[in-house]
């Protein structure tokens, strides 16, 4: 996280003008709060302005503690800002474009940036961890965690799953 810059106007302009191609590896959607974002490999500033980035280069969807981060924005509906409104029991979908992994939110907390234990693997648990700044300026972190409920091939996706990934993507 040390190399990640706050979501400033300068950072947005720099990302919009950069020629970098972002490595899209999938998507994350939380219908109850209208989150639908691409997932990029890694935590570059550009990735966090246009979607969610993976915290570990070796993590795999549906295994262990799959962790994603994205920016908080001034606008309440951009990027991971809506994580504040995720309720326990909410459905969280991620996809690697081959399967859709369905998680159920089990906790939502605000923690200190040093509380990295939330990224640890938990024996026997397949989970997701979603992280954003707790407020503009990043004094704390908002963390939503959930447990894996099912894995569905994309070809067998339900109408609800398809609708989640067809929602508007709200990024910079």
Q: Model-predicted segments: where are they?
A:
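Solvent-exposed, non-transmembrane regions of membrane-associated and secreted proteins
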Residues: 1-172
């Amino acid at each position: 996280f040390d190399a990640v810059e706050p979501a400033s106007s300068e950072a947005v302009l720099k990302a919009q003008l950069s020629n970098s191609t972002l490595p899209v590896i999938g998507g994350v959607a939380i219908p109850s709060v209208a989150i639908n974002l691409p997932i990029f490999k890694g935590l570059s500033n550009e990735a966090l302005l246009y979607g969610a980035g993976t915290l570990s280069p070796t993590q795999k969807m549906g295994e262990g503690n799959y962790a994603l981060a994205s920016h908080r924005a001034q606008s309440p509906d951009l990027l991971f800002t809506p994580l504040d409104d995720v309720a326990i029991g909410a459905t969280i979908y991620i996809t690697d474009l081959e399967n859709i992994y369905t998680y159920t939110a089990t906790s939502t907390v605000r923690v200190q940036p040093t509380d990295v234990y939330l990224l640890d693997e938990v024996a026997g648990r397949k989970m997701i961890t979603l992280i954003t700044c707790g407020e503009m300026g990043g004094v704390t972190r908002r963390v939503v965690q959930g447990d894996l409920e099912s894995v569905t091939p994309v070809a067998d996706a339900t109408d609800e799953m398809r609708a989640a990934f067809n929602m508007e993507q709200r990024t910079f």
